[in-house]
Swiss-Prot record:
Gene Ontology molecular function: any one: structural constituent of ribosome
Family, per entry: Belongs to the bacterial ribosomal protein bS16 family.
Signal sequence annotation: none
Cellular component GO terms, alphabetical: cytoplasm; small ribosomal subunit
Entry-linked Gene3D superfamilies: 3.30.1320.10
UniProt xrefs under HAMAP family: Ribosomal_bS16
Name by which UniProt lists this protein: Small ribosomal subunit protein bS16
Keywords on record: Ribonucleoprotein, Ribosomal protein
Gene Ontology annotations of biological process type: translation
Zinc keyword on record: no
Amino acid sequence: MAVAIRLNRQGSKDRPYYKIVVVDSRARRDGRYIEQVGSYDPMKEGVNYTINLEKVDKWLANGAQPSETVNSMIRKARKA
């Protein structure tokens, strides 16, 4: 089973909110996920995401592939 770390859209029309989740790479965008590792609110000013780096590191060590957007967020979180 190929595993990915990507965004899962929540919220409502014109008010998006995303969960950063670990999923089977074949799953639908908003389908079932294995574990939630963070969240992202694009409407919020300033720091608008949270990531549990311990969980992310565990999944990356097990071969999970992050999406481009999530990979960018992980890099920014490591710098902070």
